[in-house]
Amino acid sequence: MFASIKDILENPILNSNVTINGWIRTKRSNGKIGFIEINDGSTLKGIQAVINEEENQFDEKDLKNLTTGASISLTGLLVESPAKGQNYEIKTCGFNVIGEADPKTYPLQKKRHTFEFLREIPHLRIRTNTFGAVARVRSKISYKIHEYFQKNGFFYINTPIITSNDGEGAGEMFRVSTLKFNKPNNDLGNIDFKDDFFGKEAFLSVTGQLHGEAYAMALSKIYTFGPTFRAENSNTTRHASEFWMIEPEMAFYKLNDNITLAEDLLKYLLSSILNECSQDMDFLENYIEKGLIKKLENVINSNFEVITYTKAIEILESSKKNFEIKPYWGIDLQTEHERFLTEETFKKPVVVIDYPKNFKAFYMKINKDNKTVKGMDVLVPKIGEIIGGSEREDNLQKLENRIKELNLSIEHLNWYLDLRRFGSTPHSGFGLGLERFVQYSTGISNIRDSIPFPRTPKNLYF
């Protein structure tokens, strides 16, 4: 049995024999004494192993195979290190190079590589300090999401990835089909999906919300956490075609309850990573985004400002800021507008509510003015919207009217209307995109670097 490098560094037993397994990050030598840094991914910093050829007999071939990227199993004595920047090192007694790495072709050498280059080798970029740190923080966030909801009486449910519904009504969906590409059309010139696998048109899910609402109508508080897909042709630093969503749905929750939950969740997650990922967060602060920790602490220590969409537009219109897209009532807020509100006006997170219904989803509850809906967007400095949600329409007739108004299919949504026919109740929910939250938490500027294998337009490695 061997220990992880993290365990050894956190619980050192000096002058004891230890065995570690990992990959060589760096190698240097001073005559007959060699120094290699080994990392196993359990922690940001690896551990230095000293190989003294004068004290031990090592196979010449094995010594030549000690190259950057090679995997190794090494045994030695854990001692205090006289070198600066490290507390411990291993005096090597023996080692075995498990997997060689040719230094002439291994793409990750001891230098800083650009993010653009690393995106071309997503299967290897995880071996860098930056992507290792991001991966550990992402893992911690995922764990803490489950912890938060479980502690607060929520039930975790799995919603379908293949669906016949467009949960957002936007039409930006990936079709799932087993039909041959040359299948003939029907008499109307359309593809006949009766012969398809499911006997109807099927898509990859854009949200688990609608199915989540069904379970909230019985379990009261649920959350989903899974992959979602958007066929949105957006080549930006904030959009991906495949991403993970956290979507809680709560029966008997009004909009204000929804806002309170969203704020509490964000603060819980940010506090957790600052407390439990301090080494990785310090690295990201130093090398990725100066002021990162202060930015996150500002969110944790702030009371989120809640304003209406109408008030937000008034603030934007009265400002002297020269926006690329001029704000006016009826336009969806752009990132530049959201950042102005959070960074220059309030200097803290802002929750914008009561959006015009004309650009919001069909399921949002319409306000008494019949012009706005009980929607909410949580905006944070530097990135803008990070959470989107609403109180859901619980009135059957109003929901039917809204579906017809938007020319959506009553037939496809009849099951969803059943939730209003039988024991309807006020209920709310929201969505938090994991990748965008990882972006914000780590300072990574491009969403392609916050997910292991990004899927974006014209980009599908592996």
From Swiss-Prot:
Gene it is expressed from: asnS
Reactions that this protein is recorded to catalyse: tRNA(Asn) + L-asparagine + ATP = L-asparaginyl-tRNA(Asn) + AMP + diphosphate + H(+)
Xref: Pfam families: tRNA-synt_2 (PF00152), tRNA_anti-codon (PF01336)
Keyword line: Aminoacyl-tRNA synthetase, ATP-binding, Cytoplasm, Ligase, Nucleotide-binding, Protein biosynthesis
Transmembrane segment boundaries: none
GO-annotated biological processes: asparaginyl-tRNA aminoacylation
Cellular compartments annotated: Cytoplasm
NCBIfam families assigned: asnS, PRK03932.1
Main location per the UniProt record: cytoplasm
SUPFAM superfamilies to which the protein is assigned, alphabetical: Class II aaRS and biotin synthetases, Nucleic acid-binding proteins
GO terms of molecular function: asparagine-tRNA ligase activity; ATP binding; nucleic acid binding
InterPro entries (alphabetical): Aa-tRNA-synt_II (IPR004364), aa-tRNA-synth_II (IPR006195), aa-tRNA-synth_II/BPL/LPL (IPR045864), Asn-tRNA-ligase (IPR004522), Asp/Asn-tRNA-synth_IIb (IPR002312), NA-bd_OB-fold (IPR012340), NA-bd_OB_tRNA (IPR004365)
Keyword Aminoacyl-tRNA synthetase: yes
Protein name: Asparagine--tRNA ligase
Enzyme nomenclature, EC number: 6.1.1.22
Keyword Ligase: yes
Quaternary structure and partners: Homodimer.
Family recorded in the similarity comment: Belongs to the class-II aminoacyl-tRNA synthetase family.
GO cellular component: cytoplasm
